[in-house]
Amino acid sequence: MGLIVYYSSRSENTHRFVARLGLRAARIPASGADAFHIREPFVLVVPTYSSGDGKGAVPKQVIRCLNDAENRKHIRGVIAAGNSNFGETYGLAGDVISRKCQVPYLYRFELMGTEEDVANVKHGMERFWTREQL
């Protein structure tokens, strides 16, 4: 199965979700000074940071990571976290990345996700990576 690459802020919500998946994962560093290189296919799990206007939905660290052409060529899909209290911008980072990187938006979950979200993503990743290998 492919790699999960994720970013999580100090809230650790995304980190807790990814840890519950029990899949091989790598975390994008919070510090912009740290180089982060991905040299294999991956699915990105990203939180959404946006107020009601939709600006700033994708964390800067994720933008920096995907601005590296070598990293970007390995992305195969995106999963986004968000807060449904923000209405239309819920999970907006997934929409933005899916569109810009031309990859499927695979799943959206709230905050740190439920047990059902974890099960859905685990099962979905198994199916997704099986199809990717065909």
Swiss-Prot record:
A GO term, aspect molecular function: FMN binding
Record GO biological process: protein modification process
Gene3D superfamilies named in the record: 3.40.50.360
Pfam families attached to this UniProt entry: Flavodoxin_NdrI
UniProt xrefs under InterPro entries: Flavoprotein-like_sf, RNR_Ib_NrdI_bac, RNR_NrdI
Job description of the protein: Probably involved in ribonucleotide reductase function.
Family under the similarity heading: Belongs to the NrdI family.
Stored PANTHER family: PROTEIN NRDI (PTHR37297:SF1)
Protein name per Swiss-Prot or TrEMBL: Protein NrdI
